[in-house]
């Protein structure tokens, strides 16, 4: 009788353990519904997606919350040195200064390497594909024939950005002397509109939101060896165990896309939606 009792006890313990391990999947969603609010983390100063004036991600966050029958509690936060830092601070642990974590974080790169390095989060539901583009003045460059068409002319980029790294290193630095660094891509694009620059290298979304189909400017894809031509997808992230929340958000996003609401959100900010 001794060994059967041990096996029985072991079976009960494993069953209890399984219940304990599976509980958080619904416990997170239950807790959120009890609170009445969906806490959504968005980056600060990332126009046109999120800024003091709102943005695409802010509108998506509001639409997702409404789909789930909840109020929106927005948590804007400054970007860390790496996306992994942001996932730790805003998704699974919280910041040492006392804010976070949120229920879900938006604008997370849907990348296999990032997923592999961050096993405490679930990255899912890509909703946009970002790319780098060159905006240029047709007056300054009446005939565009690649990036070399702007050689010797001033080109604006945002500080500490992919565009800045690419342009400063292109062609052994042949554009370096004419690169102008700006606090944000929006400011660079505003100077392009004012005739102070010949071109701006920036994210496609940034360019579209500022230029708004202005016929005086062209937008072109420029090939860089260190940049994938297809760009990168962005989506959401929740805690790994929050499976019910992830499923609910995935379903809500699918409904927003099918109804055309996602397209309308992007259109309000002058950006063409690009499905990942």
Q: PLM features: residue spans?
A:
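Short loop->beta-strand "edge-of-pocket" segments that line small-molecule binding or catalytic clefts
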Residues: 37-44, 145-163
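N-terminal signal peptide c-region/cleavage motif recognized by signal peptidases
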Residues: 18-23
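Extracytoplasmic small-molecule ligand-binding "clamshell" domains
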Residues: 30-103
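Extended ligand-binding regions for polar small-molecule ligands
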Residues: 58-67, 138-141, 148, 153-154, ...
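A ligand-binding cleft/hinge motif common to bilobed small-molecule-binding domains
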Residues: 104-117, 166-170, 193-194, 198-230
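Acidic, polar ligand-binding/catalytic clefts
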Residues: 75-148
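Periplasmic-binding protein-like
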Residues: 43, 128-133, 204, 212-253, ...
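Ligand-binding cleft/hinge of the Venus flytrap
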Residues: 62, 66-71, 75-76, 125-128, ...
């Amino acid at each position: 009788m001794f060994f059967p009792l041990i096996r029985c006890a072991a079976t009960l313990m494993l069953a209890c353990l399984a219940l304990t391990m599976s509980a958080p999947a619904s416990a997170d969603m239950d807790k959120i519904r009890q609170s009445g609010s969906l806490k959504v983390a968005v980056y600060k100063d990332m126009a046109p997606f999120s800024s003091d004036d709102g943005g695409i991600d802010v509108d998506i966050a509001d639409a997702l919350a409404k789909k789930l029958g909840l109020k929106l509690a927005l948590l804007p936060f400054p970007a860390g040195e790496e996306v992994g830092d942001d996932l730790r601070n805003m998704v699974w642990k919280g910041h040492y200064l006392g804010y976070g974590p949120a229920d879900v974080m938006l604008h997370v790169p849907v990348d296999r390497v990032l997923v592999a390095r961050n096993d405490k989060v679930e990255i899912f539901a890509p909703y946009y594909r970002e790319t780098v583009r060159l905006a240029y003045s047709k007056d300054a460059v009446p005939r565009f024939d690649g990036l070399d068409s702007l050689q010797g002319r001033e080109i604006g980029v945002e500080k500490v950005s992919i565009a800045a790294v690419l342009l400063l290193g292109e062609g052994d630095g042949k554009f370096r002397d004419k690169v102008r660094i700006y606090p944000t891509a929006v400011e660079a694009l505003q100077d392009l509109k004012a005739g102070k620059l010949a071109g701006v290298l920036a994210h496609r979304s940034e360019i579209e939101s500022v230029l708004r189909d202005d016929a005086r400017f062209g937008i072109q894809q420029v090939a860089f060896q260190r940049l994938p031509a297809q760009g990168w997808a962005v989506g959401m992230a929740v805690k790994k165990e929050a499976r019910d929340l992830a499923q609910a958000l995935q379903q809500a996003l699918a409904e927003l896309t099918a109804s055309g609401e996602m397209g309308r959100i992007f259109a309000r900010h002058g950006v063409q939606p690009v499905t990942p």
